[in-house]
């Protein structure tokens, strides 16, 4: 009789186990679904964060580039300020050099040769002073530009003080040099003062000289 009841007990146990497995499966499905939903919801957030990080990185790079450009510009402005700070003073000193040269130029060679020793010493002192001025100018980046007769007038470097007719030269040719010009760095400190050839009436050589830079 015990043998007849044994299959029934096994059948009950089997059904119970199946019910337990089914309950576990049903219980795990909402959790898995929730995890999937959480992952799907987190996806857009990750993409947004990556986009924000990329934007911040680009802003940082642009800011660094702007800072470097500002530093270079400030350095250039500092160098220009140092180089050209004394431009007005140097321009005034050029007049002193001009006056020294005019004083020397008024003496003819024979007059200088016949002058007393004291006068010769004074002339030599004036010449030495002018040479010292030129040396000081060069030390501070100031260089002389002296056009030669026959050169073409350059409105960027020369100042035409007058025109000379009847020179048989093309209009705009430098025929007289009244004073040297000077550059400071790459800028014009003072234009060279010149006289230029004037076009003859009806002449085909050249035309009216352009005296405006």
UniProtKB/Swiss-Prot annotation:
PROSITE patterns: GRPE (PS01071). This is Protein GrpE. It comes from the Bacteria. It is found in: Cytoplasm. Its main location: cytoplasm. Residues 1-23 have a biased composition (Basic and acidic residues). GO terms for molecular function: adenyl-nucleotide exchange factor activity; protein homodimerization activity; protein-folding chaperone binding; unfolded protein binding. Homodimer. Keywords: Chaperone, Cytoplasm, Stress response. Gene3D superfamilies: 3.90.20.20, Head domain of nucleotide exchange factor GrpE. The keyword Chaperone applies. Pfam families: GrpE (PF01025). SUPFAM superfamilies: Coiled-coil domain of nucleotide exchange factor GrpE, Head domain of nucleotide exchange factor GrpE. Residues 1-43 are annotated as: Disordered. Belongs to the GrpE family. Residues 29-43 have a biased composition (Low complexity). Participates actively in the response to hyperosmotic and heat shock by preventing the aggregation of stress-denatured proteins, in association with DnaK and GrpE. It is the nucleotide exchange factor for DnaK and may function as a thermosensor. Unfolded proteins bind initially to DnaJ; upon interaction with the DnaJ-bound protein, DnaK hydrolyzes its bound ATP, resulting in the formation of a stable complex. GrpE releases ADP from DnaK; ATP binding to DnaK triggers the release of the substrate protein, thus completing the reaction cycle. One of its GO terms (biological process) is protein folding. Transmembrane segments: none annotated.
């Amino acid at each position: 009789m015990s043998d007849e009841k044994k299959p029934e007990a096994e059948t009950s146990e089997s059904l119970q186990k199946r019910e337990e497995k089914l309950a576990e499966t049903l219980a795990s499905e909402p959790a898995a679904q929730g995890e999937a939903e959480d992952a799907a919801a987190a996806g857009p957030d990750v993409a947004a964060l990556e986009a924000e990080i990329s934007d911040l990185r680009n802003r940082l790079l642009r800011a660094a580039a702007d800072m470097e450009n500002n530093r270079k510009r400030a350095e250039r402005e500092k160098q220009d300020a140092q180089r050209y700070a004394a431009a007005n003073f140097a321009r005034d000193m050029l007049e002193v050099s001009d006056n020294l040269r005019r004083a020397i130029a008024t003496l003819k060679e024979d007059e200088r040769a016949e002058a007393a020793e004291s006068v010769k010493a004074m002339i030599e002192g004036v010449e030495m002073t002018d040479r010292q001025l030129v040396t000081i100018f060069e030390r501070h980046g100031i260089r002389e530009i002296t056009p030669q007769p026959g050169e073409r007038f350059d409105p960027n470097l020369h100042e035409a003080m007058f025109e000379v007719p009847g020179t048989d030269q093309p209009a705009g040719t430098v025929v007289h040099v009244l004073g040297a010009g000077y550059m400071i760095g790459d800028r014009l400190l003072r234009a060279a003062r010149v006289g230029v050839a004037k076009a003859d009436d009806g002449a085909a050589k050249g035309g009216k000289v352009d005296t405006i830079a």
